């Protein structure tokens, strides 16, 4: 909960429950929480979605999904192909980033491929800021 002190207090009293320790939030931030332990063949994905997006139709056990930011950010542990996750996110107006690309062979970028217009802007910006292509070549996208 966040907001003014009296608003947070009133909402907390209405909702009930117990406050979580700062350790929980730090473990979550640093991906040290037990949720982030992967099984053989699983990759860790961060799905970024518009607020109020309902559950995506994915063949993933609910225990392998961690909802954050009111559901706008979802951590998913799965062996599903990258295209399956990215297509589902795109249909919902979001995108997916793989945090463990080595788990999927590391052959592709962890980031959602750019459409032609956005890629043009990326290339032009990179050309302006890094004319000699020395800063992290291929780091975000293999093509530049």
Where are these regions (language model features)?
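A conserved active-site cap/scaffold subdomain adjacent to cofactor or substrate pockets
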Residues: 1-23
């Amino acid at each position: 909960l966040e907001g003014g002190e009296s608003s947070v207090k009133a909402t907390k009293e209405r909702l009930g429950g117990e406050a979580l320790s700062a350790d929980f939030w730090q473990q979550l931030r640093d991906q040290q929480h037990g949720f982030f332990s992967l099984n053989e063949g699983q990759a860790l994905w961060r799905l970024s979605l518009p607020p109020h997006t309902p559950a995506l139709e994915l063949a993933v056990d609910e225990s392998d999904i961690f909802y954050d930011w009111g559901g706008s950010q979802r951590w998913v542990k799965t062996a599903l192909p990258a295209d399956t996750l990215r297509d589902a996110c795109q249909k919902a107006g979001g995108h997916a980033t793989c945090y463990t690309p080595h788990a999927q062979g590391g052959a592709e970028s962890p980031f959602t491929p750019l459409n032609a217009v956005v890629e043009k802007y990326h290339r032009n910006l990179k050309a302006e800021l890094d004319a000699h292509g020395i800063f992290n070549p291929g780091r975000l996208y293999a093509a530049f």
